[in-house]
Amino acid sequence: MRILIILFLGSTLFSCEDKKTKVNKIVPKKSTSTPLTKDVNPEKKESDFILNDKNVMEFFLAYDKKHLESTVRITTDFGLIDIRLFEATKFHRSNFIYLTKKKYFDQTQFYRVIPNFVIQGGNSDDRPTLRKRQKIGKYLLPNDHDKGFKHNRGMVSMPSSSIENPYKLASPFEFFIVQQQGGAHHLDGDYTVFGTVINGMDVVDKIAAVPTDSSDWPLQNVFIQKVEILE
């Protein structure tokens, strides 16, 4: 099953780099930002949208004005992790709230675990996760790294896509939590920090300690049972 993820999720997988991992360097893409269209009308039912690179920015600008929640709870196999999302990174906060309300993260996994570095979640190698992605759409988010947030321990950040991506556009379906003591500041500027753990770092540490295979995938799957809005 783990091989399947390369086949049907490869275009949006993470590329959060550590000292052993390099991000592909590729030809820049032209901007796909377009003016607000009827397809991105904020009065249209949100459930009717299929997001893409042309409408995602306008959609989340409108979504941000109506959905002001900022605190979420991640229920994992090892316990609860509460996260506060930063208002300053509005696209990433709104994206996380949107996916939470869509129940996208439910039954995904922490699929990349590196002790004293990060735990990365929001993906899976099963077909239900693929189908949820297809219903939501295919899109990337801008790198919004200049809001003053650093990759300190406990910070929540968004990895970049593994596709041709010199601007480190963010893969919206995944996130990682910095577990490293003292932070992982070599990531600053390359990835968008959009939240922080306010309760449950002991759970993060437990997940970071699980045995993994050569690709950093836990030998025993660590599930995100659900993500819910607290306030």
Annotate each PLM feature.
Residues 1-4, 18:
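Positively charged n-region of N-terminal signal peptides that target proteins for export
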Residues 4-12:
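Sec-dependent N-terminal signal peptides
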Residues 16-231:
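Cyclophilin-like peptidyl-prolyl cis-trans isomerases
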